[in-house]
């Protein structure tokens, strides 16, 4: 909800901060790939879960958010795809919009009704 600061918003801001820091520091696509693999551990440190049922789920969601922030597409859940796959196509000066504009990370979702927008105070923590 707008104006309410939550731990999910904090994680979101950390993801954008780290992606911006990576882009300003520059480097090759292999450097970006290595940094992308390390960022979930930097953003969600330690061994204790705080937002989800497992620390591994939290880091997987952060990893997916990093991919989306870098302009990469959402990975299919049914296939094993590396975090940095397709990165060489994203690390360019001009990158144009690829549909869809808004992505839903399915395994991060707590099963809110799809294709329905309702403003309530029943936040599911997505």
For each of these PLM feature ranges, what is it?
Residues 2-126:
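Ferredoxin-type iron-sulfur electron-transfer modules and their immediate structural context
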């Amino acid at each position: 909800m707008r104006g309410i600061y939550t731990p999910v918003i904090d994680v979101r801001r950390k993801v954008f901060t780290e992606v911006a820091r990576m882009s300003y520091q520059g480097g090759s696509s292999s450097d970006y790939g290595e940094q992308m693999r390390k960022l979930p551990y930097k953003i969600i440190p330690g061994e204790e879960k705080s937002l989800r049922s497992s620390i591994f789920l939290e880091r997987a969601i952060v990893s997916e958010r990093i991919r989306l922030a870098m302009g990469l597409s959402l990975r299919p859940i049914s296939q094993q795809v590396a975090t940095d796959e397709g990165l060489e196509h994203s690390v360019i000066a001009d990158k144009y919009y690829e549909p869809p504009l808004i992505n839903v990370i399915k395994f991060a979702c707590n099963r809110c009704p799809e294709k329905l927008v309702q403003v309530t105070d029943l936040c599911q923590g997505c």
